[in-house]
């Protein structure tokens, strides 16, 4: 689904709650949430579970200022320990499989995605999607798939890793899959 604010969900905001309406023909479906507060993330996970999606996805990748300024989305890339703590709490708050979407890092000096992948896997996520840019890059410049490839080929990683960024054709998707794993 379109990502949903956990604050909107726990306050029962119409705009957020409407996004939980799932039609059978939409299945399988995942519901994606974003937020930065531990209690809100846990409560939202419980609310999402009641909607019975197949997957709960956490968005730690949105680079938009109004999300980032609240330390949500890609903003959490400035505090990896907090990201891991929030993810651990969400995983423990639901019976749904939890996945995460994120970026390489906050900027070119803080591309800690290899550490992040291992730590999030260790708290129980079932898959990780990585956008090949930093938050600072937003959607500019070329996506860097090198780190995504390193993670996919890391023998310690046993969850699915999905890369994205700059894939604009089936041919390019196949080329990147062959090159990066």
Annotated model-derived regions:
Residues 1-181:
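Flavin-dependent oxidoreductase catalytic cores
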């Amino acid at each position: 689904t379109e990502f949903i604010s956990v604050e909107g969900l726990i306050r029962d905001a119409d705009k957020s709650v409407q996004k939980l309406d799932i039609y059978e023909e939409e299945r399988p479906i995942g519901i994606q949430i974003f937020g930065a507060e531990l209690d809100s993330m846990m409560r939202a996970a419980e609310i999402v579970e009641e909607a019975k999606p197949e997957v709960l996805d956490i968005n730690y990748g949105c680079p938009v200022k109004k999300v980032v300024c609240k330390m949500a989305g890609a903003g959490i890339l400035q505090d990896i320990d907090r990201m891991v703590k929030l993810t651990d709490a969400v995983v423990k708050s639901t019976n749904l499989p939890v996945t995460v979407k994120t970026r390489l890092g906050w900027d070119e000096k803080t591309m800690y995605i290899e550490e992040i992948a291992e730590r999030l896997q260790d708290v129980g996520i079932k898959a990780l999607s990585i956008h090949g840019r930093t938050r600072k890059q937003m959607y500019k410049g070329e996506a860097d798939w090198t780190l995504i490839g390193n993670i996919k080929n890391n023998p310690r990683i046993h969850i699915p890793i999905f890369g994205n960024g700059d894939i604009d054709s089936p041919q390019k998707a196949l080329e990147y899959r062959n090159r990066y794993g």
